[in-house]
């Protein structure tokens, strides 16, 4: 149980630590640094989706022979459609263009910005939850080291995400303390959805490959819909692509070394 709690808490701690940067760094993050951090986060999420979620989903379905890809295929598309639905029913703000999405709302710009990050933290919590659910179920394709690698990888990419939300809020006039707590709040959904996913998975263990790829599809939706546009916004620069490669390589190394 302690391993499970630690696994769910690690990504949230990453967000909180990143949000705490607002106490030490007084200036808003430069555009180049934001691009770099966003690219890094995208790389980690893509690698985690492949090595920690899609590959185990296919490996768990080998009994289906040539159709072993089907559960992963189905779950992937369900994850994409789930995030697409949330994108359309929850009002939120895209940081890179300042444009709102979802139904019309009287929410403040700050509230919609926090909602945007919160929305995109949901699949990360689900990813950690479903991997730890697989570990609890005794799945041979998921090891304690692999689950820890995913939790650490998401925590690493959550650190810059926490800073990217708290520091601009402070620069816009929010108090340092409020900016910190808003950043922390955006990450609170991760352990919540992680725990909910574990409970759901415990009820439908045979559907584990679908759940794994569902989380992967949801995470990749966030990467393509939000992170890639952010790391490519403004004047042309390769910094986002280079840090994407760094994030991908780091997550791949973590998964292999700890898995």
For each predicted feature, which ranges?
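Intrinsically disordered, metal-sensing/regulatory segments
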Residues: 1-259
């Amino acid at each position: 149980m302690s391993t499970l709690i630690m696994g769910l808490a690690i990504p949230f701690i990453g967000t909180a630590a990143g949000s705490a940067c607002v106490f030490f760094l007084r200036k808003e993050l430069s555009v180049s640094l934001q691009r770099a951090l966003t690219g890094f986060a995208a790389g980690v999420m893509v690698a985690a989706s492949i090595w920690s979620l899609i590959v185990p989903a296919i490996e768990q379905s080998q009994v289906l022979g040539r159709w072993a890809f089907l559960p992963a295929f189905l779950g992937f598309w369900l994850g994409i459609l789930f995030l697409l639905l949330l994108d359309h029913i929850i009002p939120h703000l895209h940081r890179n263009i300042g444009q709102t999405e979802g139904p019309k709302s009287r929410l403040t710009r700050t509230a919609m910005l926090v909602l945007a990050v919160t929305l995109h933290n949901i699949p990360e919590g689900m990813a950690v939850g479903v991997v730890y659910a697989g570990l609890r179920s005794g799945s041979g394709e998921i090891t304690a080291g692999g689950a820890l690698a995913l939790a650490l990888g998401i925590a690493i990419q959550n650190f810059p995400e926490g800073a990217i939300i708290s520091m601009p809020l402070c620069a816009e006039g929010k108090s340092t303390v409020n900016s910190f707590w808003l950043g922390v709040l955006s990450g609170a959904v991760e352990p919540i959805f992680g725990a909910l996913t574990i409970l759901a998975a415990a009820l439908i263990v045979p559907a584990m490959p679908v759940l794994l790829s569902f989380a992967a599809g949801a995470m990749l939706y966030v990467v393509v819909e939000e992170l890639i546009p952010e790391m490519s916004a403004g004047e042309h620069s390769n910094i986002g692509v280079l840090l994407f490669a760094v994030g991908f390589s780091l997550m791949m190394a973590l998964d292999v070394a700890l898995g």
